[in-house]
């Protein structure tokens, strides 16, 4: 028999890298077509006028203009690009 306890293993000791999510262009900012507006998981913000949605739910500008945050249907947050 061993005279000392063996070192135990642990299931902790790792962490994932930050994914840099969030708003990248704020309300009132001037943007050009293709600029990323928001990186998100799921549709926290929905795409509005002149805004496209990528397969990972990234919202991006389709035209040049000014960013405007708004509500669609009174409850759902959305983002528009105003000319």
UniProtKB/Swiss-Prot annotation:
Signal peptide: none annotated. GO terms for biological process: translation. It is found in: Plastid, Chloroplast. PROSITE patterns: RIBOSOMAL_L27. The gene is rpl27. Keywords: Chloroplast, Plastid, Ribonucleoprotein, Ribosomal protein. The keyword ATP-binding does not apply. Residues 1-21 are annotated as: Disordered. Belongs to the bacterial ribosomal protein bL27 family. This is Large ribosomal subunit protein bL27c. GO terms for molecular function: structural constituent of ribosome. It comes from Phaeodactylum tricornutum (strain CCAP 1055/1). InterPro entries: Ribosomal_bL27, Ribosomal_bL27_CS. NCBIfam families: L27. The keyword Chloroplast applies. Its main location: plastid. SUPFAM superfamilies: Ribosomal L27 protein-like. GO terms for cellular component: chloroplast; mitochondrial large ribosomal subunit. The lineage of its organism: Eukaryota, Sar, Stramenopiles, Ochrophyta, Bacillariophyta.
